[in-house]
Amino acid sequence: VKCYAVVDTNVIVSALITKNPDSPPRQVFRAMLTGDIVPLYHPDILAEYEEVLCQKKFHLQVETVRTVVDAIRQFGIEVQPKPTGEILIDMDDLVFYEVAMEKRDDGAYLVTGNQKHYPVRHFIVTPAEMVEILKK
């Protein structure tokens, strides 16, 4: 099953720094690279990925970060969402939510480790839930 999904930065970070190759974030990340998940993005999302992943605390090489961001750009679809008017706890998260909303007609999901940052919606799922959806 091919799924469209906006993947929150925290999931990408977890996928890249985990020691567990079978962790749900790693499985979601792998699915983005194999085409099981078509990543949806906006330039602001790619910029956030790059900014966060380059933080020293994650010990990731700049080349690794660029490769990841380029792969998401290459395999994904750029979305220019319409404003939803939604007010979120962290307004930096709004672009992730709005990109998912824009592609809801295609069944898009938002995959995040921080569900509390978003309104409760059935399409906002954890990495573990996304792994289960992919198995269907």
PLM feature segments, named:
Residues 58-59:
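Membrane interface segments of multi-pass transport proteins and intramembrane proteases
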Residues 105-136:
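Acidic, PIN/NYN-like endoribonuclease modules and their adjacent C-terminal/linker elements
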